[in-house]
């Protein structure tokens, strides 16, 4: 439940105006550390990937737009400007996710268990993903 709240808070903090007291409270909680923050990826126009995409070839995938790159920079700046500790950044193998992580946080690792189960091609990963995410939250928080 804490993870879901943090995801929603980060999303709201980056996308809508909120009153100053609420924003300070959010930032204060994030500055304490010990949070698992999930960011899918910045803006990549469209939906899904082409049927014949290759996880190892960015040219076959839906990628960040210039707006998405700017959004990634803003995400990174939010964390830097507010001294929010980052212990570890992990990305899926999708190019749009890796690019978001690179622009926002510079250093990141990839893990295939974070790969989307959006398409039928990867739907079998869902149970494993949920288990590994739970394990990850227990280890790193």
Segments (PLM) and residue ranges:
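A well-ordered secondary-structure block
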Residues: 129-135
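Active-site-proximal alpha-helix that buttresses catalytic centers in soluble enzyme cores
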Residues: 21-121, 130
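Sec-dependent N-terminal signal peptides
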Residues: 4-14
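Sec/Tat signal peptide C-region and signal peptidase I cleavage site
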Residues: 16-20
């Amino acid at each position: 439940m804490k993870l879901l709240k943090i995801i929603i808070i980060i999303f709201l903090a980056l996308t809508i105006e909120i009153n100053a007291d609420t924003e300070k409270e959010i930032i204060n909680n994030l500055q304490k550390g010990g949070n698992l923050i999930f960011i899918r990826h910045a803006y990549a126009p469209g939906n899904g990937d082409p049927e014949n995409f290759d996880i190892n070839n960015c040219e076959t995938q839906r990628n960040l737009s210039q707006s998405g790159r700017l959004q990634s920079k803003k995400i990174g700046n939010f964390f830097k400007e507010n001294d929010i500790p980052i212990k570890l950044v992990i990305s899926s193998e999708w190019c749009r996710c890796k690019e978001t992580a690179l622009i926002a946080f510079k250093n990141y690792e990839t893990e295939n268990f974070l790969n989307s189960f959006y398409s039928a091609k990867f739907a079998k990963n869902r149970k494993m993903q949920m288990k590994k995410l739970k394990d990850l939250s227990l280890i790193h928080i």
